[in-house]
Amino acid sequence: EVAPSEKWLGLLVLLSVTDAGIFCYEPETYRPKEDYEVDVGKSQLHPSRKIVADLSQIVERFWESKLAEGEEKGRLQGDGAVCSCCGATGDVLSVYSKAWSWFTTTWPGPLSIFLNENELVNGVALCPDCYKALTFGSNLFNRLTTTLPMWLTKEMFAPVDNASSREHRSEAEDIFGGVMALPVLDPSEQREEDRAEYVESLMHMAEGVTEKKGAGALHLDTITGIEQELPMHIAGEDMYRLTMLYFSGDPSRGDVHLRASIEDVLPSAAQELTDMIHDLFDDSYALQGQLFKEPLHERASRPYRSLPAMLSKAYGMTRMWSSLAQTLHRKSLPRDLFVRHAALRMQDLSRKVEDKYYLLQHEVFFYLYYDQFLHHYRQWIGEEGGYRVTPWQDLLRLLDARAYRDIDIDGVADLGFAAGYLVRRFSRLYYHHTDQKQFLRDRVITFGSKLGPDTIVEYALKRMIEYAFKLKFDGAFAKDEELLGLVLAEYQRQTDDVRRQKDEFMTSFWAGYCLNRGKGKSEKDDSSTRENEEAQLMSE
């Protein structure tokens, strides 16, 4: 049943019924030929008969009408009529037609100023066979194309260097994406059963993603953002290559703005990359628990389970498409730019760290999470050298246990992490001995100054013993003076490296700061702030 409020649609068809035409009468007991005929309905004029349609004749009339549409922009015949696609001669039609909406003339495209609209066939033309192939292909491509999720497009267009602006992301324009699987071999070189399976797989893809994932099928949304399912016949064979097309605008009018075209992607590479991201997120539950006390909600975790979302946050919208192509082609990804953007976002949040603490935690999570992704990715593509990754769990375990003599501060990242951990521990003591004052806000980040390595050393680390003595918690802080001495000594030894790798130091500093959960209360109860900001993240 249809609800009264639901919109009803109807189709009125005028049929010319004859004894041997496209539509003809047949006895009620007549069974239409499978794949060649179809029942239209019972005859009202002849109750004992029904109307049957001849599909083969309908197809012929369909192509006649489609070719007539193409002829509206011009048709050429003779030896001088050459197909722009296959080179056949004799009969060609204009490509600017209704075969594909991208080739319509309803927008100010780069059409020849020397040709009238009905003479466009002299520009680009197709023979009838290629015109039919274009019609088939365009309809299939339209069925394989979908709109990217709004949360993903908002993530893509969000500022890469300002965390506060990312909170107030406006509606972004729609971006369309489509995935095509193309065979490596020419169809003439394929076995008949392979061609049949390929066509069946394309039809499966055109139906869209099913609720129940097919056996062996690969969902491509993780690495492409496109809700598309790759059937097992294609996903399990490298005899095919994937092509992704991203565009915006109004495709129905041919007003298309191409964003990216990524070709020659191996299905096996797509599968391995998808598995890598899934495994990476599963392995991040310990980090989620350390930062947020509980796993991220489904909506809040979406950006960390999407390759396009991660790349846009790491490198920005302007480099996201090229980075996506590099990743799908197993090429090197830069790390310095990702660290730079992470440092800028953390610096923006540090100005109001007590109010933006939950967002800062998300930035720290992304920094450690994507850094681990880069580490696994470089191993996957066989890239040698690079950088050393110290598992945050190992360093945090030693710091929590105050096993300072066992700590090997190897590099700027380890130094920044230890400094951040120590500042957070001292801030907690300062908070409980100063009527709940904020150490960073009131003593370190003052008068609009920016927090950097020199500021941390001069106004935080070097004054800790003095503040602890004046506020009478020097006894409680005495257990951490060994760590303070270690950090200051290492800073003096690595000063030049820190200045060259300032972003590395600061991102690691905030990682150590946020991962220090402590055993008592934090400087400020940020549960209400967390709930508000988490609700905002989940609503997007």
What are these regions (language model features)?
Residues 1-41, 45-49, 93, 137, ...:
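Extended alpha-helical scaffolding segments
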Residues 4, 8, 68-70, 82-83:
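Intrinsically disordered, low-complexity regulatory regions of eukaryotic proteins
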Residues 46-72, 104-113:
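Short Cys/His-rich Zn2+-coordinating modules
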Residues 75-82, 120-123:
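Short metal-coordination and nucleic-acid-contact micro-motifs, chiefly zinc-binding Cys/His arrays
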Residues 83-87, 127:
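Short cysteine-rich clusters marking metal-coordination/redox-active sites
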Residues 88-116:
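Short recognition patches in nucleic-acid-associated and regulatory proteins
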Residues 90-92, 132-135:
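Short functional micro-motifs and their immediate structural scaffolds
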Residues 112-133:
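Short beta-strand-alpha-helix junction that forms the catalytic/metal-binding core
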